[in-house]
């Protein structure tokens, strides 16, 4: 769009052109797609992690191959930098898929301090009525000391960054020839990652930096390097004898 063109003109050619001027010329050429009126940004309560790897968001989205075969794309992004850590194509995303791709991602980028996902069964069993205990992904997070955060049901904006990433990804994919196989789709995703992380300025980042620049600009958080204590407030009733029970690590 106009912002991206202005960024490239400034950073690669030393030419300063107002975004409004670029928008006007694109609109005159019929190259601007009208978008629905959105809620003002000020109406949202925004959270942004202070450090890279302080919080990873994950989710998967749906895509169809040229022969209408259904596929699912699993995405991991860094909350602080919007850096796309991993984007992989699968016939179907399962709990085993999530665990495998998470392990590959931490091998490349380190262990995050926390993760944020929705309440899909591939990520958590917390809404399953206590049946079956933790799934493999939850057990892995506990083993690594990673704080797991799940969105409140019916509040999709909690995972808004990865949802917005899906929109950007699909817009790019729609402009490419439709892949005929999972392998072809993965090659397209790899090409998109290079473009998105390293060559595309992000409007939500300071100075419209690229996600790769923001991801490498500060030290990474990890389970042993926490930016807050995550203290929890608990309210209890005092019994008739005036006694209180204190808990440590969930035990009285």
Protein language model annotation of sequence segments:
Residues 14, 48-50, 66, 128-129, ...:
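Conserved, non-catalytic sequence blocks in retroelement Pol enzymes and Pol-derived host proteins
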Residues 117-119, 127-171, 185, 190:
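RNase H-like two-metal-ion nuclease catalytic core shared by retroviral integrases
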Residues 197-252:
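C-terminal, beta-rich DNA-binding module of retroviral/retroelements integrases
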């Amino acid at each position: 769009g106009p912002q991206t063109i202005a960024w490239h003109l400034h950073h690669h050619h030393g030419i300063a052109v107002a975004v409004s001027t670029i928008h006007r010329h694109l609109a005159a050429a019929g190259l601007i797609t009208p978008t629905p009126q959105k809620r003002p940004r000020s109406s949202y309560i925004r959270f942004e992690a202070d450090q890279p790897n302080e919080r990873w968001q994950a989710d998967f989205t749906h895509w169809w191959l040229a022969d209408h075969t259904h596929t699912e794309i699993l995405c991991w992004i860094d909350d602080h930098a919007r850096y796309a850590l991993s984007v992989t194509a699968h016939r179907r995303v399962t709990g085993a898929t999530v665990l495998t791709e998470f392990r590959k991602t931490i091998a490349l980028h380190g262990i995050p301090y926390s993760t944020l996902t929705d309440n899909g069964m591939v990520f958590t069993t917390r809404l399953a009525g206590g049946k079956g205990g933790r799934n493999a992904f939850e057990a892995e997070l506990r083993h690594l000391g990673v704080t797991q955060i799940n969105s409140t049901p019916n509040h999709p904006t909690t995972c808004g960054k990865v949802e917005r990433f899906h929109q950007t990804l699909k817009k790019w994919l729609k402009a490419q020839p439709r892949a005929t196989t999972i392998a072809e789709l993965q090659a397209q995703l790899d090409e998109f990652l290079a473009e998105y992380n390293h060559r595309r300025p992000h409007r939500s980042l300071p100075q419209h930096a690229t996600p790769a620049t923001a991801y490498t600009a500060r030290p990474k958080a990890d389970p042993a390097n926490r930016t807050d204590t995550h203290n929890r407030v608990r309210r209890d009733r005092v019994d008739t004898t005036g006694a209180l029970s204190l808990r440590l690590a969930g035990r009285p």
